């Protein structure tokens, strides 16, 4: 049996730009891509915490240490500068691989710099 699991997450990324006329995609600071293990052109799922929009696109590189998160093309209608996003990637695993796998969780500040990382989401309590 195969299961799709969270591979990586950029938590609370802040949109810095929207570029409607750009050729689709989401440009992400190259340091963030590398730290999260996201490949250029890899499919990403974006969850907009500000307005509730959810959409799928692909990642492209933005300048190192720029803090850029630019939502481009048609997806630019789904975000505004200042919106907070969760950007996720997923991977398919065999059940035998699941126990040893841990996702890369990258937590960001208001300027899209890394505050801390992790590999487990805390248990939600009442």
UniProtKB/Swiss-Prot annotation:
Is synthesized initially as an inactive proenzyme, which is activated by self-cleavage at a specific serine bond to produce a beta-subunit with a hydroxyl group at its C-terminus and an alpha-subunit with a pyruvoyl group at its N-terminus. The modification Pyruvic acid (Ser) is found at residue 25. Substrate binds at residues 57, 73-75. Transmembrane segments: none annotated. It catalyses: L-aspartate + H(+) = beta-alanine + CO2. It is found in: Cytoplasm. Binds 1 pyruvoyl group covalently per subunit. It comes from the Bacteria. GO terms for cellular component: cytosol. InterPro entries: Asp_de-COase-like_dom_sf, Asp_decarbox. GO terms for biological process: alanine biosynthetic process; pantothenate biosynthetic process. It holds the Pfam family Asp_decarbox. The keyword Manganese does not apply. The active site is at 25 (schiff-base intermediate with substrate), 58 (proton donor). GO terms for molecular function: aspartate 1-decarboxylase activity. Its EC number is 4.1.1.11. PANTHER family: ASPARTATE 1-DECARBOXYLASE. Catalyzes the pyruvoyl-dependent decarboxylation of aspartate to produce beta-alanine. This is Aspartate 1-decarboxylase. It comes from Nitrosococcus oceani (strain ATCC 19707 / BCRC 17464 / JCM 30415 / NCIMB 11848 / C-107).
């Amino acid at each position: 049996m195969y299961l799709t699991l969270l591979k990586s997450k950029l938590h609370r990324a802040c949109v810095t730009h929207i570029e409607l006329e750009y050729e689709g995609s989401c440009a992400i600071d190259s340091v963030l891509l590398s730290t999260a293990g996201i490949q250029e052109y890899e499919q990403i799922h974006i969850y907009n915490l500000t307005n509730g929009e959810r959409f799928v696109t692909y990642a492209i590189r933005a300048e190192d240490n720029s803090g850029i998160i630019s939502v481009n093309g048609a997806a630019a209608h789904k975000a505004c500068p200042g919106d907070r996003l969760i950007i996720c990637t997923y991977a398919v695993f065999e059940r035998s691989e699941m126990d040893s796998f841990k996702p890369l969780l990258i937590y960001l500040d208001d300027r899209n710099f890394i505050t801390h990382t992790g590999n487990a989401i805390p248990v939600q309590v009442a």
